[in-house]
Amino acid sequence: MGIQGLAKLIADVAPSAIRENDIKSYFGRKVAIDASMSIYQFLIAVRQGGDVLQNEEGETTSHLMGMFYRTIRMMENGIKPVYVFDGKPPQLKSGELAKRSERRAEAEKQLQEAQAAGAEAEVEKFTKRLVKVTKQHNDECKHLLSLMGIPYLDAPSEAEASCAALVKAGKVYAAATEDMDCLTFGSPVLMRHLTASEAKKLPIQEFHLSRILQELGLNQEQFVDLCILLGSDYCESIRGIGPKRAVDLIQKHKSIEEIVRRLDPNKYPVPENWLHKEAQQLFLEPEVLDPESVELKWSEPNEEELIKFMCGEKQFSEERIRSGVRRLSKSRQGSTQGRLDDFFKVTGSLSSAKRKEPEPKGAAKKKAKTGAAGKFKRGK
């Protein structure tokens, strides 16, 4: 789920924090990608006649086709992807995971009813709601990536938290995921729609945390409190407080604790046994991989092993896979060329061809605590 309504809220109250770019704008950029989110997208989008792709044995192959071709597309545009896989979910997420199981059970029931009624559109809708990324999906994608010469990392816990740590440490330019809580984990730059289908023609959205904090007049700890009020995967929110009200309250009272002290408990009852302090700690001090121990390396694809796996085992067309391997090898030759701005120190929150807007007076003071939650210093 991420953070409820955060993307729309930022668009409404801090629009200068969002840029929209074409994929070609990221030539030479290293990007940490939330692997589970991407695989989920592939299982939803890569379909034939409404059903997931399967081989003759009935094994799902949509995730492999999506991972293979979307990764090649990124490489052809000069992007160097590193996929980060989820580890063990934090205990705080158990409530959210239980709710998801309940929703899947309800979707299963509705699917059976739609099938009995012959309602094709409803069948497709509820089938997609049952999609779940499994350990087998993850393991097969890891194997595919290793054969393609694309690096991947196993996070100890939430992938988006480790993606954020890689950005903060300067190992990659941005974190790519649809989950907005990557910003709550402190990622300086978040990219959305990077692995979306080309057919959707969605521009890549780029969110800059420093500009969000500046526009809202918040530090990272206060932004975390705002996100908890909006609704996250880790604890309940206070019912009756919408996005605009949440912003007003955090700007006025500066912390959840002070907000709770001032609220009318009859009008805005605080959840029983509210775990907001635990959620604060999880966002500010998440369990992440050590960026300094990470060495990212992109290597030549292993064509024959790819053929053996994708064609021999998974029954993809050999002609198409070999064509993909040729594209991948060719893209590596072009992507070795670096970006010009890699050779210079880039200042400001928006380092792009677009001119940076002048900062309002006093903004420097507001930025003093930006990124205070991060454990890692940004690399050179």
Swiss-Prot record:
Protein name per its UniProtKB record: Flap endonuclease 1
List of residues that carry Phosphothreonine: 336
Stretch list, region Interaction with PCNA: 336-344
UniProt cross-references to InterPro entries, sorted A to Z: 5-3_exonuclease_C_sf, Flap_endonuc, HhH2, PIN-like_dom_sf, XPG-I_dom, XPG/Rad2, XPG_CS, XPG_DNA_repair_N
Entry note: cofactor: Binds 2 magnesium ions per subunit. They probably participate in the reaction catalyzed by the enzyme. May bind an additional third magnesium ion after substrate binding.
GO biological process: base-excision repair; DNA replication, removal of RNA primer; positive regulation of sister chromatid cohesion
I-domain, as annotated region: 122-253
Compositionally biased intervals (Basic residues): 363-380
Region N-domain: start-end pairs: 1-104
Cofactor needs: Mg(2+)
Gene expressing this chain: FEN1
Region (Disordered) location: 327-380
